[in-house]
């Protein structure tokens, strides 16, 4: 093979495959332009434009899902089109849309630049979508940086609030540190996959093909370990979770809601694709090949991480008196539950089982996004401008003064707990069943015990709302129309996904995941 031809091959440019991402990026630029020329009383237009852009991206994604019959890859394998990408894209669009609804009145009340915020949100959404569609480690990193840079700014968007500034700085410093781990891991894998005739590769499918003949196994192990650390930070797993409570508490509540659902799902999308498809289970050589040893190593590491993440998240959440910090530790615990499904996918012995486990993880993250955003929407209403009321005692007796808000928050908390007939219950059933199918009985028992532990702090807040009397004056807040719409959507989602999950699950399984041989 001609080396120059290999290095400088013309890329197979196919803009149709990245149409949703192009729409989101174009809307991000358009929102900035509109904001620059709009009158102060017309700044709400930027939120409407962003919602239209998300709707257009959703339509284009649906078209790709239902009617696209072209190539499943583009740009020389940098972008892929499969169930994993499209399923996560749907989650990202839902998360961003709900975040806009929650934030439209918030930016007005805080006297912040609505156009800047919504534009940053659009670019963060594009970054998440690129992470899910990445077929190459370089694309994973580019998508991650687009997402991270936008999110750093959003955390510090309340410029006059020292807590917001501290949140942004902590996230920036620790996020940069984790990105360095990820990038160095990519560099090591590139070097380890080089041969005498071919340069190294960062293409995920090509890495899997070269594993049996890898000449530098220690570099591969080191690279995989560093990427595990990088992804662990992004999805807030123990012991890489220490940034989460401070950042979530200090960031503006709509930003916290977005970060707890969107970037976490994006991290899982890339994490799944890289470790399941670059280091897959290969039956015939599982015990004596480089790929088999790497697979066994990361799977064992994930089991330990999942147990630590579920346990630490739930135990520390019990001691929290700030609702945002409590939900931050809850977010850590839910990352552990999602890892249970990830482990099941990694241990699957055939493609059908692997795809079923991947679907379980996607469904779980969808349910978590819906109920988590709903909970933060209520927290935002109660906290009011400046996030002044976020302590547990601020919720004393609101079940009598604002019964609708108390009912909504109670429903979301019960769903986060995993009560039957709610989305959270079906999400946990899916990931736990996938783990049981692979024989991880002890892991599932630990997950169920952690669910029981989480009942303490979820039910505690419900008890405070309905069985405690207020000791301070408090007037029931008005629910803005946009936030009311977000609450209606999330309540519908919690009930629909809990009562009729099969329809969503079947849709997620309609398009096969990127094929990797499991010979």
Segments the model singles out, each with a brief description of its role:
Residues 1-519:
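Alpha-helical transmembrane segments of multi-pass membrane proteins predominantly involved
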């Amino acid at each position: 093979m001609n080396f120059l031809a290999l290095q400088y091959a013309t890329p197979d440019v196919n803009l149709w495959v990245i149409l949703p991402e192009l729409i989101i990026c174009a809307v991000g630029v358009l929102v900035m332009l509109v904001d620059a020329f709009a009158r102060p009383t017309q700044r709400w237009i930027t939120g409407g434009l962003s919602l239209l852009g998300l709707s257009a991206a959703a339509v284009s994604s649906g078209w790709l899902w239902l009617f696209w019959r072209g190539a499943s890859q583009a740009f020389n394998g940098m972008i892929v089109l499969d169930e994993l990408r499209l399923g996560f894209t749907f989650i990202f669009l839902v998360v961003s849309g709900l975040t806009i609804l929650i934030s439209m009145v918030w930016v007005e009340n805080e006297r912040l630049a609505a156009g800047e915020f919504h534009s940053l949100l659009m670019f963060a959404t594009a970054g998440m979508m690129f992470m899910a569609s990445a077929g190459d480690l370089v694309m994973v990193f580019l998508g991650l940086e687009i997402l991270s840079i936008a999110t750093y700014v959003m955390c510090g968007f309340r410029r006059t609030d020292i807590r917001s500034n501290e949140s942004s700085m902590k996230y920036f410093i620790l996020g940069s540190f984790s990105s360095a781990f990820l990038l160095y891991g990519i560099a090591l894998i590139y070097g380890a996959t080089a041969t005498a005739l071919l340069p190294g590769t960062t293409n995920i499918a090509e890495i899997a093909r070269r594993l049996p003949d890898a000449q530098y196994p220690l570099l591969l192990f080191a690279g995989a370990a560093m990427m595990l650390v990088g992804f662990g930070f992004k999805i807030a797993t123990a012991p890489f979770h220490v940034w989460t409570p401070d950042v979530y508490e200090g960031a503006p509540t709509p930003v916290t809601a977005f970060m707890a659902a969107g970037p976490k799902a994006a991290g899982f999308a890339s994490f799944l694709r890289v470790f399941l498809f670059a280091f897959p289970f290969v039956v015939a050589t599982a015990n004596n090949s480089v790929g088999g040893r790497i697979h066994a190593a990361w799977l064992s590491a994930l089991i330990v991480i999942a147990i630590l993440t579920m346990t630490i998240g739930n135990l520390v959440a019990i001691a929290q008196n700030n609702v945002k910090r409590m939900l931050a530790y809850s977010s850590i615990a839910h990352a552990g539950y999602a890892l249970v499904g990830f482990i099941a996918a990694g241990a699957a012995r055939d493609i059908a089982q692997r795809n079923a486990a991947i679907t379980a993880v996607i469904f779980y993250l969808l349910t978590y996004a819906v109920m988590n955003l709903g909970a933060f929407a209520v927290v935002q209403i109660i906290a009011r401008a400046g996030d002044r009321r976020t302590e547990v005692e601020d919720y004393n007796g609101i079940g009598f003064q604002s019964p609708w808000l108390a009912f909504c928050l109670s429903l979301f908390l019960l769903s986060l707990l995993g009560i039957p007939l709610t989305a959270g219950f079906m999400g946990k059933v899916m990931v736990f069943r996938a783990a049981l199918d692979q024989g991880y009985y002890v892991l599932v028992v630990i997950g169920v015990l952690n669910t029981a532990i989480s009942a303490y702090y979820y039910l505690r807040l419900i008890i405070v709302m309905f069985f405690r009397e207020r000791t301070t004056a408090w007037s029931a807040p008005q629910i803005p129309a946009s936030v009311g719409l977000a609450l209606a959507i999330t309540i519908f989602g919690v009930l629909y996904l809990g009562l009729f999950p099969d329809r969503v699950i079947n849709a997620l399984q309609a398009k096969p995941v990127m094929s990797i041989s499991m010979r």
